């Protein structure tokens, strides 16, 4: 059910240089970044021909060649890593952008807010994408989040034309 979010993101990316990092629900993103679907399936089945030689499994699909830096089993663990990838690109003079996906459950992690602060302070080339289904581990987001003042753009992932207005800048 996350394919629409990816489709909009890919439309805004330059696949020859931009990077992506995500959470543990990461089966479709590597394929969108150009990873062979057979390698993704091999990883899911624990085969040596998988993206991580069958050792990463469902949560840890990875392809440096395709600038896909994997899924991560720690809730919100990919958020500071995404900023770190963007910092590296900025430091080395690259104009690549890193897309960092996270779920609404990760929005209550302290590392998210610390990372947002550093990303804004250092003007990092990173776009944080919250895939918000409205419930984080059975808790409505209105009960535990107050993020309305953060700079953001809302995008309906089902409306492909809406993604054009949210194009990465």
Residue ranges and their predicted role:
Residues 126-128:
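A positional/architectural concept
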